[in-house]
Amino acid sequence: MNKANSFNKEELIACGHGKLFGPNSPRLPVDNMLMMDRIVTINDNGGEFGKGEIVAELDINPDLWFFDCHFITDPVMPGCLGLDAMWQLVGFYLGWEGAEGKGRALGVGEVKFTGQVLPGAKKVTYKLNIKRTIHRKLVMGIADAILEVDGRQIYSATDLKVGVFSDTSTF
């Protein structure tokens, strides 16, 4: 298992193919749905709650796929993609901890949007504070997160929940 404290784009893509933490670990999406270019830091003892943190980044450029279709003449990154990135990172954290199975978003307590990601932005930064992880019959991670664009916080989410399941056929 790879317990590194940072990951580059190639390693994140490898996670999507089951080649970073192993073939049975939770996977990140690949291609357009992978909403980060790097994980700058990941640990299991930092953050606001002392139970772990993740900081990840997405480089923004006007050629990103979503700017062409959301919206015509008013391009903006869909807020749901930033939220999905937060869930992706909670699932990644569980795989980094050694969980096996398929990751699924289970919910979120509250989401607030107070700004937007436009094509002229340079960088999105995701900052997650792990609140709790459970590794029993139920494997689940819970985190609070913010999204910053060029250093300005524009999204926040509390109680992001991701579960890892050995069987999703009845989910």
Swiss-Prot record:
Its EC number is 4.2.1.59, 5.3.3.14. One of its GO terms (molecular function) is trans-2-decenoyl-acyl-carrier-protein isomerase activity. The active site is at 70. It holds the Pfam family FabA. The keyword RNA-binding does not apply. It is found in: Cytoplasm. One of its GO terms (biological process) is unsaturated fatty acid biosynthetic process. Keywords: Cytoplasm, Fatty acid biosynthesis, Fatty acid metabolism, Isomerase, Lipid biosynthesis, Lipid metabolism, Lyase. InterPro entries: FabA, FabA_FabZ, HotDog_dom_sf. GO terms for cellular component: cytoplasm. It catalyses: a (3R)-hydroxyacyl-[ACP] = a (2E)-enoyl-[ACP] + H2O; (3R)-hydroxydecanoyl-[ACP] = (2E)-decenoyl-[ACP] + H2O; (2E)-decenoyl-[ACP] = (3Z)-decenoyl-[ACP]. Coiled coil: none annotated. Transmembrane segments: none annotated. Pathway: Lipid metabolism; fatty acid biosynthesis. Its main location: cytoplasm. Belongs to the thioester dehydratase family. FabA subfamily. Necessary for the introduction of cis unsaturation into fatty acids. Catalyzes the dehydration of (3R)-3-hydroxydecanoyl-ACP to E-(2)-decenoyl-ACP and then its isomerization to Z-(3)-decenoyl-ACP. Can catalyze the dehydratase reaction for beta-hydroxyacyl-ACPs with saturated chain lengths up to 16:0, being most active on intermediate chain length. PANTHER family: 3-HYDROXYACYL-[ACYL-CARRIER-PROTEIN] DEHYDRATASE, 3-HYDROXYDECANOYL-[ACYL-CARRIER-PROTEIN] DEHYDRATASE. Homodimer. HAMAP family: FabA (MF_00405). This is 3-hydroxydecanoyl-[acyl-carrier-protein] dehydratase. It comes from Shewanella baltica (strain OS155 / ATCC BAA-1091). The gene is fabA.
